[in-house]
């Protein structure tokens, strides 16, 4: 309301019940002792874990996700986390659909693709929900079941990406990636579900903030650079019609070097990435 009165926002709207259920509290509105939090009009509620950081508690946001309630606490800390040891190693990463990440050292990493695994169950629960009467308790139960499955899919994806990005930041000092047009890729109806399932944007987000935390560097190559079609040995660029997406291995007509398409792309990304995304 304050921002509306100052002319910085539109007239506020009421949040509908059951949609994005959450509320915020300032540090004088709640109390935190060990694994318990005191919330106004609710009293003491048990928490699953203790506060992870020591510092001044600023605020709390209580929200519902996947049929469960969570609290997110904002904490002001005095010191930064311990930096990861320097390894003096660099790597280029080519993101793809068959293999989520191909590293310039030849390593190929496959993603779990949780949406693909749970798709049949997801369709079944969606069908069950559509058949329930609006406003009924059975519809609420069906909605909760569907919400829990969506949350589980999201957790599997994020857990895998957290482990992957943490490993990369621990192993390399300089990480080079490509600037993918994820929004444009999602518009392709044949690829949209697969792209969303892999989590390209989330991978980049995690990689950049973790590299910032530990004094590592993330670089990016422009999205129009032909990393797959350029020979990493001599720089010869193949014509688009001579190198289709179905071609996974190719031989450079100029220097006769044989390439794995994705490994070659990751080597080019390592050599050509120049835009620094991190603060370090």
Residue ranges, per PLM feature:
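Nucleic-acid substrate recognition interfaces
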Residues: 1-280
């Amino acid at each position: 309301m304050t921002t509306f009165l100052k002319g910085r926002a539109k007239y506020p709207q009421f949040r509908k019940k059951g949609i994005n259920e959450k509320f915020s509290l300032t540090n004088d509105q709640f109390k935190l002792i060990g694994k318990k939090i005191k919330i106004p009009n609710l009293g003491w509620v048990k928490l699953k874990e203790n506060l992870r950081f020591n510092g001044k508690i600023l605020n709390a946001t209580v929200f519902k996700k996947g049929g469960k309630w969570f609290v997110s606490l904002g904490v002001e800390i005095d010191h930064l986390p311990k930096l990861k040891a320097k390894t003096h190693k660099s790597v280029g990463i080519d993101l793809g659909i068959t293999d989520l990440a191909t590293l310039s050292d030849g390593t190929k990493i496959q993603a779990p693709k949780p949406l693909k695994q749970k798709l049949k169950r997801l369709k079944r629960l969606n069908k069950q929900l559509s058949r329930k009467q609006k406003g009924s308790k059975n519809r609420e139960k069906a909605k909760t079941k569907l919400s829990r499955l969506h949350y589980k899919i999201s957790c599997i994806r994020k857990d895998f990406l957290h482990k992957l990005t943490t490993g990369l930041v621990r192993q390399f000092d300089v990480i080079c990636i490509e600037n993918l047009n994820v929004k444009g890729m999602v518009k392709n109806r044949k690829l949209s579900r697969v792209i969303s399932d892999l989590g390209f944007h989330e991978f980049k987000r995690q990689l950049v903030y973790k590299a910032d935390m530990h004094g590592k560097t993330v670089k990016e190559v422009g999205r129009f650079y032909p990393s797959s079609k350029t020979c990493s040995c001599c720089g010869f660029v193949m014509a688009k019609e001579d190198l289709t997406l179905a071609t996974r291995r190719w031989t450079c007509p100029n220097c006769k070097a044989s390439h794995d398409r994705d490994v070659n792309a990751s080597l080019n990304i390592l050599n050509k990435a120049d835009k620094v995304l991190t603060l370090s």
